[in-house]
Regions:
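Soluble FAD-dependent oxygen oxidases
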Residues: 1-501
Length: 501
């Protein structure tokens, strides 16, 4: 895929890939950035030392050894949707291992567990599971996102309240470690590695195969949406208060998925109900959200059709997932730390007056809870088991992201934080990476970070699998105040779980 000067790195990569020029690229290649690097966030320029496209786990292992021998960092890429370009290293000089060729799929019809290649995209996974017996698993809505990153960092989607996060479906992995060993990991084999991969995978290895538990596809489902125009931000604030009260009801069925999307055009309350239209109508959504401009409900009896509809909705919102200059922030909220009415009023007042610097911005509140909360926080590296809903805000610049746009999104988080009673450990969802966080690892992994650091030091002591916010080695100073607060929240969650679910 391009000529290069002869170095130990280039020679080693060529040898690892049997000299197949289609399976590697170096910076000397014409159109290297456009065709091979392909950064998702155009505001963060990154030039990897090499981009590779192995076809087997053995080739992945060989590339890891070559990179480690050269003293370089390694990061895997599957879908390539990292907000901070961590899948290409996050900074210059990493070796990228693109997993696009790892596409194998096999369903065991006796157990309904599937073996899935680490390079599989969510859209392909949905189709393959359907064709193998009308099976499904929880995952996000963007079909171009890769399972390799999604199921090793969290993996939330509309069906997560029913089935859990994507990583909760994972029962075994084949993973390439920093010393280039290929190992199997599960709850009984290499359990520490398995624990770490389920929430912080990119810091520990490259998953070349997943074994996942599947569920029968749901039957009839209802997709709903209620649109509200900007007319008055005070009106939108009242609608959001209604939504928060509704979704925080301990008796809310797990069949109900929902999100609030705030944008330049107004606000949308939308989601999916995993049940019949008759069941959905009993929720009386029309009465709960009066004053809407438009209201639509679509009944799906075809799982592929519903998942495709999710993807189309996301495509409209994200411009098809194309690379763009963007900035993003996130927060998490649990049932014990709901946003007070005054803070909601402050947020919408802020949105009304602030200079945003772009017309393409979104503030999204995604309902979580349900089955995701059933799993104890210490059971996997994924640490946001007490989350009721997530805030994700992002904006796209035209040509570049303006400073006013960055200030706008920072102000969203600041306004909410300042309006909270105090003492909250919000944390940040590791799938919504934010390179501006002062202590990203603590925000992402919370009380699980110390154990992750110990495992990291044991299996990757040279920190080969690294990006700017990956799990640091043991001994790296970590603040202790936030984790203590987090443990209080976990105890509260466990009490609430007995009452709520």
């Amino acid at each position: 895929m391009g000529s290069s000067q002869s170095t130990p790195l280039t020679n080693g990569i060529k040898a690892a890939l049997n000299g197949d020029e289609k399976l590697y690229a170096f910076p000397s290649k014409i159109a290297y950035q456009l065709e091979d690097v392909r950064p998702y966030n155009l505001t963060i320029p990154v030039k990897p030392a090499a981009v590779t496209y192995p076809k087997t786990a053995s080739q992945v292992a060989a590339i890891v050894k070559v990179a480690a021998d050269a003293g370089l960092k390694v990061q895997p890429r599957c879908g390539g949707h990292s907000y901070a370009n961590y899948c290409i290293g996050g900074v210059d000089g990493a070796v990228v291992i693109d997993l696009r060729h790892l596409q194998h799929f096999q369903m065991d019809r006796s157990t309904w567990k599937a073996k899935v290649g680490g390079g599989t995209l969510l859209g392909d996974l949905t189709k393959r599971m359907h064709d193998a017996g009308n099976r499904a698993m929880a995952h996000g809505t963007c079909p171009q996102v890769g399972l390799g990153g999604h199921a090793t960092i969290g993996g939330l989607g509309p069906s997560s309240r029913l089935w859990g996060a994507a990583l909760d479906h994972v029962e075994e992995v084949e993973v390439v470690l920093a010393d280039s060993r290929i190992v199997r990991a599960s709850a009984t084999e290499n359990p520490d590695i398995f624990w770490a991969v389920k929430g912080a995978g990119a810091s520990f290895g490259i998953v070349t195969e997943f074994v996942v538990r599947t569920e029968p596809e749901p039957g009839e489902c209802v997709h709903y949406s209620y649109s509200f125009t900007v007319g008055s931000y005070a009106t939108l604030a009242a609608t959001f208060k209604t939504w928060q009260k509704f979704v925080s009801d301990p008796e809310l069925t797990r069949k109900f998925a929902s999100e609030v999307i705030i944008s330049e055009a107004g606000m949308i309350v939308s989601g999916t109900f995993f049940g019949s239209e008759a069941e959905f109508n009993k929720l009386e959504m029309n009465k709960k959200f009066p004053g809407y401009k438009d209201h639509h409900t679509l009944v799906f009896r075809d799982w592929l059709g519903l998942v495709a509809h999710w993807g189309e909705t996301v495509a409209l919102r994200l411009a098809g997932g194309l690379a763009a200059p963007l900035v993003a922030k996130s927060l998490t909220f649990n049932g014990a730390d709901l946003i007070p009415d005054k803070a909601i009023d402050s947020l919408f007042s802020y949105l009304e007056r602030v200079e945003k610097g772009t017309l393409v911005w979104f503030i999204i509140f995604d309902l979580a809870g349900g089955a995701v909360n059933d799993v104890p926080q210490e059971a996997t590296a994924y640490a946001h088991r007490d989350a009721l809903f997530y805030l994700q805000s992002y904006a796209v610049g035209i040509g570049k992201v303006k400073s006013s746009t960055r200030k706008f999104l920072t102000g969203v988080n600041t306004t909410i934080r300042n309006g909270m009673p105090g003492g909250q450990d919000f944390g940040a969802y590791p799938g919504y990476v934010d390179p501006t966080l002062v202590n990203g690892p603590l925000e992402y992994w919370r009380t699980n970070l110390p154990r992750l650091q110990q495992i990291k030091s044991a299996v990757d002591p040279r920190d080969i699998f690294h990006n700017p916010q990956s799990v640091p080695l043991a001994g790296t100073p970590v603040p202790t105040s936030a984790p203590k607060i987090a443990m209080v929240r976990v105890r509260v969650r466990k009490v609430l779980a007995k009452l709520c679910f």
